[in-house]
């Protein structure tokens, strides 16, 4: 199987895209996205096992948000940009490791991949289907997608001057847990529920950012007629 992605509701045959995404995503882009997520999990492993306080690593926090946000549905299919981000996050990971004593690190916190070919080769061994148990796999991915959505909200909130260090703490904890094979289905169900809780907190943070900057939404009358002057077409996803 050249790729596997079932991140959205429009996947091929409602099972997953295995040759090319229905969205147009190419195989190599899907694999690079998988490796970027794996790299962020490795950073989380270092943060958790090295007992690093999220409040003390703001730049790392922001890069983690950016990395997760890059992999959401239809956000970024630029292979060069994703490859560059993988390289950056490996460097970030190594910088963290140099500052702490963290024993028993996972492969995600240890591997290196220099260049596109090496990255694609590594990506083939860390994709979604590496988790054989379907229930565990599904729960892990549900949590991952929840974290991606959370990162998107948190990134937008950050651009509005709002952030919450507790969100970063949870993200690191959750992503590190996704590397732990001792986490069974029951543990992952509990983590899924917590992911939802923090997702709501991220939404509240973004709402606070929007309302503090733009005010509270109000019912407003607008002209919906057609004119000859230029218009702006707005679409949503």
Residue ranges: model-predicted function:
Residues 1-237:
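Metallocofactor- and cofactor-centric catalytic cores in central/energy metabolism, strongly enriched
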